Amino acid sequence: MSDSDDSNFSEEESEHSSEAEEAEEAEAEEERASAAGSEKEEVEEEEEEEYDEEEEEEDDDRPAKKPRHGGFILDEADVDDEYEDEDQWEDGAEDILEKEEIEASNIDNVVLDEDRSGARRLQNLWRDQREEELGEYYMKKYAKSSVGETVYGGSDELSDDITQQQLLPGVKDPNLWTVKCKIGEERATAIALMRKFIAYQFTDTPLQIKSVVAPEHVKGYIYVEAYKQTHVKQAIEGVGNLRMGYWNQQMVPIKEMTDVLKVVKEVTNLKPKSWVRLKRGIYKDDIAQVDYVEPSQNQISLKMIPRIDFDRIKARMSLKDWFAKRKKFKRPPQRLFDAEKIRSLGGDVASDGDFLIFEGNRYSRKGFLFKSFAMSAVITEGVKPTLSELEKFEDQPEGIDLEVVTESTGKEREHNFQPGDNVEVCEGELINLQGKILSVDGNKITIMPKHEDLKDMLEFPAQELRKYFKMGDHVKVIAGRFEGDTGLIVRVEENFVILFSDLTMHELKVLPRDLQLCSETASGVDVGGQHEWGELVQLDPQTVGVIVRLERETFQVLNMYGKVVTVRHQAVTRKKDNRFAVALDSEQNNIHVKDIVKVIDGPHSGREGEIRHLFRGFAFLHCKKLVENGGMFVCKTRHLVLAGGSKPRDVTNFTVGSFAPMSPRISSPMHPSGAGQRGGFGGGGMSRGRGRRDNDLIGQTVRISQGPYKGYIGVVKDATESTARVELHSTCQTISVDRQRLTTVGSRRPGGMTSTYGRTPMYGSQTPMYGSGSRTPMYGSQTPLHDGSRTPHYGSQTPLHDGSRTPAQSGAWDPNNPNTPSRADEDFEYGFDDEPTPSPQGYGGTPNPQTPGYPDPSSPQVTQPYNPQTPGTPAMYNTDQFSPYAVPSPQGSYQPSPSPQSYHQVAPSPVGYQNTHSPASYHPTPSPMAYQASPSPSPVGYSPMTPGAPSPGGYNPHTPGSGIEQSSSDWVTTDIQVKVRDTYLDSQAVGQTGVIRSVTGGMCSVYLKDSEKVVSISSEHLEPVTPTKSNKVKVILGEDREATGILLSIDGEDGIVRMDLDEQLKILNLRFLGKLLEA
C-alpha cells in the first residue's frame, strides 16, 4: 500500500470515528506525515490543485442563485480573494464555531454529523494553515448556516430594512394628491378640511378622503390622501383657499410618497468657540464655550466658570459639622479658580502641564474649568451669551462672536454681504483673491475679481468669502456690541479691525464681518431713539450724568462725580432741559450753557471748554482737545472762570425781568432786569433786552479779527450795537459775529470796531470797559485819587435829574446831558457807605456828581501816582475847584457792557487798593464782545490830561495810568518768569525770580525757585523778566496775547519773534513779551 493510499484511508476512517478517537488519529497522522517527507507534500498539493480546478469548473456551469437573506454574504464572497477579507474571516472563526456548537443540539442528526465533520476539517485546516482551504470552508459554512436558519426556522426576526419595506405604500393603498393652496394658509386649510370631514362624517355623503398633510417646508400646496381624484374634488369643493387647485390635482408617485413625511433629524454640528448652556446639575443654565467635540463618544469638552463651594472645603478640612453640612445643598456662586485660596483652606491642588488639578477636575491657569459632558446634557440651539457673561470669559468681549449661529444640516449659513462690499476668498483654489460684490442671491455671491487675468464675474458660496478693509476706510458697525457707530479704520489686524469712532473718539475693536463701508456719520442716537450722545440723564434722584458712549445694550455715563459708569437703557431717565440754567463761576460771573470757560482748579485745571449742561454746582464741559470720553468732562462751577465769554444766545428766549442776578455787581442793560422795570428811558435809556439796528455798518466789508473765523472777510448784512450778521466771501456762509471782533477793511485802526452807541467806549479816557458793570470808576480807585467828588474818568457823575438823554440824541459836550451808564434799580445793590452826595440842584444848576459803588476814597492807597486836575474848574463842594459844566461820558450810555461776561474781578483786591487802571487799558481776558487791539503805551513819562471825548482827528489820548505799568494785572499770564518787586511785604521773597503757575483775578500763584515754594502774590508786586536773544517768549500784551515764539534778535526796544503757530516773523515791543521757563 502506497503512502497516498494510507493517507486516504486515514482520512476516511477519521470522518466516521467518534470524537474520542480524533485526537489519537491526529497524532498518528502527524507521525506518518513527518515520515513521508517532502514527497508526500508535493503529491497532496497536486491533488488539491486538481480538486480546486474541478470545483471552479462546476461552479461556472452551475447557474447563480438569488440570495434569500440580503446581500451581505454575496458581497463577502465576491471579494473573498482579497487578503484583508481573509484576515477578517479568520478573526471571526472562533465565534462561528461556538455558535455552531450551541445550535448543534437543536437540529436533527444529519445536520449534526455535517457540523461535526466540518469542525474536524476546521481543526485540520488550522493545523496545516492552508489559506485557500480556510477561505473555502468559511464561505461554505457561513452560507450553509444562513440557509439552515432560513429553512429550519433558526431566526424569526427580520432586519429593520425588511421591516420598513413592508410598511411602504403599494398599489392597493390610497394615493397622495397635491392640491394648490393659498400661500401661508396651508395649516389653516388642513384644519378646515378636518372640520369638514367631521361635519360630514355621519351624513349620507361623507368625505372619502383619508388624511390631509401640510408640511412646514412646502409652501402653496397641501397633500390629500384618497383613492380617487373625484374623492379629492368632493372634499375641497367650497373651500376658498383651495379654489385655485380645484380643477387640477396631481398624484404623487408611490416611490415619492415616503419623502413627503420624511423627518430629517437635525444633527447639531458644534464647533470650537461656539456657545452652549447646561441643562441640569450644579451648572444649570450656565454659559459654556465649546473646547472640542468627540462625536464618536458623544461627548463634548466645555470651558466654563467653575462653581466651587469654599465653605464645604473648609468644613471638610476641619471635620466640624461635616456630616450635618454635607446634606445641605447650596449652589455656590460662579468664580474663577483660585489655587492660592484653595491651598490656604487646606485643599490639595496638583499641576499637570498647563492645567491645575483639583478634586479630579482640570482648571486652566486663568481659572476656567475644562470638563467633559454628554451631548444630551447641553443646550445648543439659540444660545446667545449676554454682555456680562462675555466679559467674564474675555477682557475684550468684542473679540468673541456675539451672534453665534449654530449651523445645522440643510440650513444655510447666515451672512451680511451686500453689493458693493470688498471681499476676498478665504477658502478653495482662489484663496486671497480680492474682488467686489456685484449681486447677492441667497448663499451665492457674485463678485468681480480684482485681477488682471480675470475679467469675468465669479460666483462663490458665502462661506468662502470674507470682507476686507484697508486703512483709511470709513465704515459703519452693523452688528455686535458697537452696532450703529461709525469711524475711520486706523489699523487692520488678522481677524480684527481697529477703527476710531467719529462720535466718542474711542478706538473700537470689531470683527470685519460686522463692518460695512459708508460715508455718513453716526447720529449719536440709540437704537430706541430715546437717548443721544452728550445727553444729560438722571441715574438716581441725586445723581445725573452725561452719556459718553452708546452701545447696543448699555450706556456709558459720565456722572457728576467724574466716574464713568455702565448702565442699561432702562436704568436712566432723560433729564429736563436745562438750557436756561445759570450758575456763578469762581469770580461770581454769571455762566450759562454754551459759555466758554477755563478751569482754574481741580483735576482738569488749565483746560478750556464749552458748557454743555449745568446741574446744581456741577458743569459738564466739552473740550475738542480732549480725547477721553469724547471730550466730555465734569468739574465744579467754582473751579471755572468765564474765559472768552459765551456764544451768542437768543435773547428772545429771555423775558424782561426774568432773571435777577444774586451778585450786586451784575446789573447792566444787557440783562434787562434793571432798566426794563423803570418803564422809561432812565437808567441808561431804552434798555429793552434787544439791540437797535445799526444801518451805518450794513453793507461794509469787514474782517474778523478774533475767534474761530479769524482772518475771514465778508459783507455785513445786518447789525445791531452788539452783533453783526456777516456773509463770508470764501464760504458764502452768513454767521453772527460780535462787533468787537470786526475790523472795517481799509481802516487804519488796528483794533476792533466801536459801536456808535457807546456800548463799549473806545480806548482811552472813556467809560470803563466790559467787566466793570455799571460802576465808575473801575477797580475802586478814582482819578484823582483823593477827594472823590472830582470828576474821575469822565462818566462817574450821575445826575439825579434829566437822565433821559443819550449821546445819540445830543452832543457829547452838552452840559445838560448826563452820559453815565445805567445804574442798578435796587438801592441795596450799592453799599450804604458810598460817597455821600450833596443835595440835588434844580434844573439848570450844577449837576450833582455821584460816584456809586466804592468806599470812601480817602482810604489810604498803596501808591499815589500823579493826579491830573481838570483844567479850568472852579471850586465846588469839598474841592478847591469845580467845573461849571457836567462833563459827559462820550458814547457811553445806550447799553453799557454786560456784567456777566466779564472775565476779571471787580471787587477791590483783598491786599489793598491797586493803582489806577485806565478804562482803556488792556484787560486780561475780555469777553468776545471786547476783543480790542492793545493800546500803545504813552510815549512820555507823565500822563496827559484827559479830554472828554475822542478828538475829531481820531487821536485817542490816554488817561492817567493807561501806560503799561508793571503794577497793572493785564499782562499777567501763566508759565512766564517774573520777579518779585520791592513793594511786597515779605522781604525774603523780594528780588526772587519765579514762574507763574496760575492766575485768579489779580492774584498769581508763583513758584519761587530759590525758596522752592509756591506763594500767592498780587500782580502789582510782580514784574515780568525781560527776555534776551534766543529765549522762548510769550506775548503778554497786544492782539497776539498768549502766543508763543522764539526771540531771534533785539533792536532797541523791539524784538523780532518767530511765532510758533504760523512760523511768521513779527516785530513786538519787548514790554509785550514775557520770558518762558526753559525746559
Swiss-Prot record:
Residues 676-688 have a biased composition (Gly residues). InterPro entries: KOW (IPR005824), KOW_Spt5_1 (IPR041973), KOW_Spt5_2 (IPR041975), KOW_Spt5_3 (IPR041976), KOW_Spt5_4 (IPR041977), KOW_Spt5_5 (IPR041978), KOW_Spt5_6 (IPR041980), NGN-domain (IPR005100). One of its GO terms (molecular function) is mRNA binding. Residues 1-30, 41-61, 75-89, 826-836 have a biased composition (Acidic residues). Residues 1-89, 664-700, 739-970 are annotated as: Disordered. Keywords: Activator, Nucleus, Phosphoprotein, Repeat, Repressor, Transcription, Transcription regulation. It is found in: Nucleus. Residues 173-267 are annotated as: Interaction with SUPT4H1. Belongs to the SPT5 family. Component of the DRB sensitivity-inducing factor complex (DSIF complex), which regulates mRNA processing and transcription elongation by RNA polymerase II. DSIF positively regulates mRNA capping by stimulating the mRNA guanylyltransferase activity of RNGTT/CAP1A. DSIF also acts cooperatively with the negative elongation factor complex (NELF complex) to enhance transcriptional pausing at sites proximal to the promoter. Transcriptional pausing may facilitate the assembly of an elongation competent RNA polymerase II complex. Interacts with SUPT4H1 to form DSIF. DSIF interacts with the positive transcription elongation factor b complex (P-TEFb complex), which is composed of CDK9 and cyclin-T (CCNT1 or CCNT2). DSIF interacts with RNA polymerase II, and this interaction is reduced by phosphorylation of the C-terminal domain (CTD) of POLR2A by P-TEFb. DSIF also interacts with the NELF complex, which is composed of WHSC2/NELFA, COBRA1/NELFB, TH1L/NELFD and RDBP/NELFE, and this interaction occurs following prior binding of DSIF to RNA polymerase II. Also interacts with SUPT6H. This is Transcription elongation factor SPT5. It comes from Gallus gallus. The lineage of its organism: Eukaryota, Metazoa, Chordata, Craniata, Vertebrata. The gene is SUPT5H.
